[in-house]
C-alpha cells in the first residue's frame, strides 16, 4: 500500500464508519471494512511516522446523532481487536504471555453497544458507546426495552454494558409491517436494532421489541476476582442470559469457536463472532490497553457468508474525480438477514480479471452489509444468454466522451453533475473545510434546485433561498450558514486538500502550505519535486490542476482567505535531531510528531545511521530491532519528556 492509497483508505474507512455507527446505514460489508482496516493497520505499523490524525485505528465507535444530548461514560467504553484465524489467535495468546491463563468465551452479538448506569438501584442513564468517552443519552428509549431492568437490588454505583439486538423473527415481522405501510424495508437486524435505539420518538423504540444482552461492566466496586463472577452477579440481577458462556483453557478455545459457529443459524439473534477474554480481572488490568483496544480481550470473527446469485446488469457510478465505477446489479438474494441487490465490481480491469458477463451465476460474500463482493464466476453454468460487459465510451451522467486509462475510465467534463456534486461534498467534509450540515443529501438538493453549481457558490447561499426548500427550518438554515461562514479563514492545508487535486492528499497539502504558503499555486516543477515525498506524478498533477483551475481557485481563495500557520521552533535538546517514532505510545503519533517538529527536530519514517534516537513505545517492532543493530540510541516516553525540558 502506498501513502496515497493509505490516505484514500483512511477516508473510505471513516466514511464507512460514519455510515455504520452514526447513520445506521452501512456502505460496506464487515469483511470489506475489516480487510481495508487491517491493510491500513499494516501500513501504520510499517510507517508509524505517517499515521493520519484521522485514522480509524485510533478511534472508537462513532459520534453523537443530532437530536440527542451528549453524555459521558464513567469508565471508557473500549472497542475490541478483531482476529480472523487460529494463527492470529495464537499470536494474540503469546502477546503478554496469556497462554496459561483461563478465558471466558461468549457470543459476539451483532447489534448496538449500550452502557446502563445504575445508582441506588435505579436506572439513571443509558448511553450509546459513541467515541468511547461520550455517547448519546438514550435513557428514555432504553426504558422502553423490557429486558432492561428499571431497578435492581444492588444499591452501589455500577455501569452494566451490553448489546442491544433484535431477534431474527421480530426483524422479519417488522419488515412485513413496514411493507404494509409502504415503507422501505430495513437492511438487516443489526441496523434495525441500532436505528431503533436511536429514535427521537421513544414510542417507535417501544414497538421494535429490542433485546438487551449484557456482556460486561464499567464502573463498579463489587470486589470480585473474575469476569465470570461479575457476569453471574449481573445476570442474577435479572438481566438476559445466553446459554453459551464458557470458562476455558487455551486448548479448548478452538472447539468452542467451532461449536458456536456451527450453531450460528440456530441462534435467535445475529452473531458475528466469539469474544475471548481473560477471566482474571487483576491480570486484565496488568495487561492494560492500547490506544483503542483492551489487550485482555479479542473478537474471533466468523467467516463471511457466501451465496450464489445472478448478475443481471452493470450500473455505472461517477465519482468526484471523474472515475467511472461499475456496480453489479444482482438477482436479489437474502444473506444472513439482509436482502442484497448489488455488488461492487471495483473497476473494468477487475471485470476482465474475473471474466464475468451479464447473466453469469456468481459467488458473493458479505457480512452485515447490502453491497457484497463477487468472489467467483460459475462459468460452467452458462446457458448462452450471457452478454459481455463493455467498457463505456460515454459518461452515464453527462454524456461526454470518457478517457480510458486502463484500470480507470474517467469523465473529463468538469461540469459533469456527478463530479461537481462529489467535489462539493469532498470540500465540505470534516478533513477539509468541515462544513457541518453540508452532506450528500443537502448538496444534491442544492444542486438540483440550481442554488449551487460549483464550490464557490456555497458562499453565496442566502437565508431566503434555503428557507424556501422543503425540510429547512430557521434553525437548520442558520446552522448551515454559520458553518459556511466559520469555514472562512481555514488552514491553507485544509483548503488545498478540499480542492480535490488528484494525488494531493492531506500530507502533500501540508507540505505545500508549509513550503510555499499562499504562493503554492506558482510552485514550479523543480520546486515541487525537491520537496520530500513529492514525486513526478504528484508534481505534474498539481501543475496541470493549477493551470486548468487557476481562476476558480484564486476567486475561491479571495472568499475563504485561508490562513498559514507559522510554526515557531522552540530550542531545546531536541533541536536539529533526527527522530524515529515506533510502537504504541500514550499519545497519538501525529501529536508527538508535530511536537517534535516544533522543537526543530526532523521525524523520519525509517532508522539509519543518521538517526539520532528512536522513541519507542509498547510493542515496538522492526524499527527497534534496526536501531539496536545500528547502535542508535533508544529512549522511552519518560526520557523524551525529560529531553523536552533541556534547553
UniProtKB/Swiss-Prot annotation:
GO terms for biological process: DNA repair; DNA replication. The keyword Hydrolase does not apply. Residues 569-647 form the BRCT domain. It is an enzyme of class 6 (ligase). Its cofactor is Mg(2+); Mn(2+). NCBIfam families: dnlj, PRK07956.1. PROSITE patterns: BRCT, DNA_LIGASE_N1. This is DNA ligase. It catalyses: NAD(+) + (deoxyribonucleotide)n-3'-hydroxyl + 5'-phospho-(deoxyribonucleotide)m = (deoxyribonucleotide)n+m + AMP + beta-nicotinamide D-nucleotide. DNA ligase that catalyzes the formation of phosphodiester linkages between 5'-phosphoryl and 3'-hydroxyl groups in double-stranded DNA using NAD as a coenzyme and as the energy source for the reaction. It is essential for DNA replication and repair of damaged DNA. The active site is at 108 (n6-amp-lysine intermediate). Belongs to the NAD-dependent DNA ligase family. LigA subfamily. NAD(+) binds at residues 30-34, 79-80, 106, 129, 163, 301. Its EC number is 6.5.1.2. GO terms for molecular function: DNA binding; DNA ligase (NAD+) activity; metal ion binding. Keywords: DNA damage, DNA repair, DNA replication, Ligase, Magnesium, Manganese, Metal-binding, NAD, Zinc. The keyword Transferase does not apply. Zn(2+) binds at residues 395, 398, 411, 416. It comes from the Bacteria.
Amino acid at each position: 500500500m502506498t501513502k496515497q492509497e493509505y490516505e484514500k483508505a483512511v477516508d473510505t474507512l471513516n466514511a464507512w464508519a460514519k455510515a455504520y455507527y452514526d447513520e445506521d446505514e452501512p456502505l460496506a460489508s464487515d469483511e470489506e471494512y475489516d480487510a481495508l482496516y487491517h491493510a491500513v493497520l499494516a501500513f501504520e505499523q510499517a510507517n508509524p511516522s505517517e499515521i493520519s490524525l484521522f485514522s480509524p485505528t485510533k478511534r472508537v465507535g462513532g459520534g453523537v446523532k443530532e437530536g440527542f444530548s451528549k453524555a459521558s461514560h464513567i469508565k471508557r467504553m473500549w472497542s475490541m481487536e478483531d482476529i480472523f484465524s487460529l494463527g492470529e489467535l495464537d499470536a494474540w495468546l503469546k502477546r503478554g504471555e496469556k497462554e496459561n491463563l483461563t478465558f471466558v468465551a461468549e457470543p459476539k452479538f451483532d447489534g448496538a453497544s449500550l452502557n446502563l448506569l445504575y445508582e441506588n438501584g435505579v436506572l439513571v442513564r443509558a448511553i450509546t458507546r459513541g467515541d468511547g468517552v461520550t455517547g448519546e443519552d438514550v435513557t428514555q428509549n432504553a426504558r422502553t426495552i423490557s429486558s432492561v431492568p428499571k431497578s435492581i437490588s444492588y444499591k452501589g454505583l455500577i455501569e452494566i454494558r451490553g448489546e442491544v439486538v433484535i431477534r431474527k423473527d421480530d426483524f422479519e415481522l417488522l419488515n412485513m409491517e413496514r411493507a404494509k405501510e409502504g415503507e422501505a424495508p430495513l437492511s438487516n437486524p443489526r441496523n434495525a436494532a441500532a436505528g431503533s435505539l436511536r429514535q427521537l420518538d421513544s414510542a417507535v423504540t417501544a414497538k421494535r421489541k429490542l433485546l438487551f444482552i449484557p456482556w460486561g461492566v464499567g464502573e463498579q466496586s463489587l470486589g470480585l476476582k473474575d469476569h465470570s463472577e461479575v457476569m453471574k452477579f449481573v445476570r442474577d440481577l435479572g438481566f438476559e442470559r445466553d446459554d453459551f458462556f464458557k470458562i476455558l483453557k487455551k486448548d479448548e478455545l478452538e472447539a468452542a469457536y467451532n461449536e458456536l459457529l456451527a450453531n450460528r443459524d440456530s441462534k435467535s439473534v445475529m452473531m458475528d463472532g466469539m469474544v475471548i477474554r481473560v477471566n482474571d480481572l487483576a491480570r486484565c488490568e496488568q495487561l492494560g490497553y492500547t490506544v483503542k483496544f483492551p489487550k485482555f480481550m479479542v473478537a474471533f470473527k466468523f467467516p463471511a457468508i457466501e451465496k450464489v446469485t445472478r448478475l443481471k446488469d452493470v450500473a455505472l457510478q461517477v465519482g468526484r474525480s471523474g472515475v467511472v465505477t461499475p456496480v453489479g446489479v444482482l438477482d436479489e438474494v437474502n444473506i444472513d438477514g439482509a436482502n442484497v441487490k448489488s455488488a461492487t465490481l471495483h473497476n473494468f480491469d477487475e471485470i476482465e480479471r474475473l471474466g464475468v458477463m451479464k447473466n453469469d451465476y456468481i459467488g458473493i460474500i458479505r457480512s452485515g452489509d447490502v453491497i457484497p463482493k463477487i468472489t467467483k464466476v460459475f462459468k460452467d453454468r452458462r446457458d448462452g444468454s450471457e452478454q459481455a460487459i463493455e467498457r463505456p465510451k460515454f459518461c452515464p451522467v453527462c454524456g461526454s466522451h470518457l478517457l480510458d486509462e486502463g484500470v480507470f475510465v474517467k469523465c473529463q467534463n468538469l461540469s459533469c453533475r456527478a463530479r461537481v456534486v462529489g467535489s462539493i461534498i469532498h470540500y465540505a467534509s470534516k478533513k477539509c473545510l468541515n462544513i457541518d450540515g453540508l452532506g450528500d443529501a443537502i448538496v444534491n438538493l442544492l444542486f438540483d434546485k440550481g442554488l449551487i453549481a460549483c464550490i464557490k457558490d456555497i458562499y453565496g447561499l442566502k437565508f431566503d433561498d434555503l428557507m424556501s426548500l422543503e425540510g429547512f427550518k430557521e434553525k437548520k438554515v442558520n446552522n448551515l450558514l454559520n458553518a459556511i461562514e466559520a469555514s472562512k479563514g481555514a488552514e491553507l492545508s485544509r483548503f488545498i486538500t478540499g480542492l480535490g487535486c488528484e494525488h494531493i492528499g492531506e500530507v502533500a497539502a501540508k507540505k505545500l502550505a508549509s513550503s510555499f504558503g499562499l504562493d503554492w499555486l506558482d510552485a514550479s516543477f523543480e520546486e515541487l519535486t525537491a520537496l520530500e515525498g513529492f514525486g513526478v506524478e504528484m508534481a505534474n498533477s498539481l501543475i496541470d490542476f493549477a493551470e486548468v483551475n487557476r481562476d476558480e481557485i484564486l476567486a475561491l481563495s479571495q472568499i475563504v482567505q485561508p490562513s498559514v500557520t507559522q510554526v515557531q521552533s522552540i530550542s531545546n535538546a531536541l533541536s536539529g535531531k533526527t527522530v524515529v517514532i515506533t510502537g504504541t505510545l500514550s499519545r497519538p503519533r501525529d501529536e508527538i510528531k508535530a511536537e517534535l517538529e516544533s522543537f526543530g527536530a526532523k521525524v523520519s519514517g525509517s532508522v539509519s545511521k543518521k538517526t539520532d534516537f528512536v522513541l519507542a513505545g509498547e510493542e515496538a517492532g522492526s524499527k527497534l530491532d534496526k536501531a539496536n543493530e545500528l547502535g542508535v540510541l533508544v529512549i522511552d516516553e519518560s526520557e523524551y519528556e525529560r529531553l523536552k525540558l533541556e534547553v
